[in-house]
């Protein structure tokens, strides 16, 4: 195999303020599940750096749940499609697909024999359905609510019971199969966000936006108590999860805390304060084996520490929004990956372990469009917030210095030796020296798009929407147009010099990469065809003999300079999402990022 996936650094859950986020547990206790965009992410609970991504939904996925057998996962999306797929093989073959109703699926529950599924959400005519997993035949009706149903659960022992919670401020109780509506529970005064049966089936709990948690008898539906008396939390409660032994309950709230309750004596055992900002609101939780997980509005997944509630054991960070750009850099003998996303967030990753964090302090406030590292070890990033930032990779702290404010929005930045950087903006080209603007071309006469600086530091190549690459010289503190045009095959989308400066690669919207030979006066060296859609990014391997291109066709090609026919094709590098950026860690390791908010490392062999 000329390529194989080496590592997957998965995205965070996609979260929305005021909406509960479901994290699915694994009956075997190894993994946990959540969704982001069109992806379902499976992660190892002991080592979250081990991840697998399922991308077969055509629409945004909302919820995914393991069957109690552990062999299948059911996932539901905003269009009302429910897919049931295999977990035992890497391919995740589809077993069944259903459309229980037209509209967003918000929660899924299985019976303990993995044979029946209940699905709820916001359909047009109905808000829920319960059916056999292998035929889709109905095994009851979910009625009794007049608004969207947020949550459903089924008692995991016979006789079966089913409970739902809805935006009509009510929970409902069903007996079955076939499941029939028994009664409505109107104890809450606000939306009911979550209902969950205890693993032994003796109790079920409901949690609501009114800050209350009520406990009921699992068999009869009679009210047992209100946790914490008058109020369980000072804010809305978005999620609850029972301990495996059914004695305790974990709750997650908009008051920025999670709590553990001892249900039998109705008391709080631990309170986990998660922070003071809006992003610290708790929207989801999972209690699996000894692990207590909660999800913050920031998308971060917190591993809670019962022995020290004030500080999580571990926080999984990363991106929850699409990644736009990436760069790599060796620091203290280790290779790090730096990725910048659509929301202005920059993350750094240890390329070996996947350990990652974001920079300290206040950084970009809008999409990070391009990043590169200069010779003094500073990360230079340009963003839609109209700034270029210089950030020390030793400190990894956004300092008040190191921000260059531009007149117009920058699109791309490239660095050369001697403290030079060239920024391409909308209708403007700016030369920076030692973090200061020293020259600009205000009306270049074409729309510049991308820029590369020759490793020698004297020549700048700028690609335009008009399909040409123009060459400029850096003379002291000015840029001089050399008057030389290199023709691409379409609007230029990226340009890159090889590390030895011998070649310039240019990719375009017409699906072609053209390589020019620098020593021969930029004569055309070779043309590379293969992509099925616009190419958006390029990166040269350190060996200067190979380069990679990524496109809107979800493909990555690794090309051989001397022979366009010798190529490695990575199909569906990021399935259903186009490749946004590429970089090489070494001659055989390629890193790709995409709008699926994940980072992947590939081993390439020639």
Curated annotation (Swiss-Prot):
Single GO cellular component term: cell-cell junction
Alphabetic keyword roster: Acetylation, Actin-binding, Cell junction, Cell projection, Cytoplasm, Cytoskeleton, Disease variant, Phosphoprotein, Repeat, WD repeat
Entry annotated with the keyword Phosphoprotein: yes
Predominant location: cytoplasm
Impact when changing residue 286 to V: In PFITS; uncertain significance
Protein location: Cytoplasm; Cytoplasm, Cytoskeleton; Cell projection, Podosome; Cell junction
Disorder named in the UniProt entry: Periodic fever, immunodeficiency, and thrombocytopenia syndrome: An immunologic disorder with variable manifestations including early-onset recurrent respiratory infections, stomatitis, cutaneous infections, and neutropenia.
Protein name: WD repeat-containing protein 1
Organism: Homo sapiens (Human)
Gene encoding the protein: WDR1
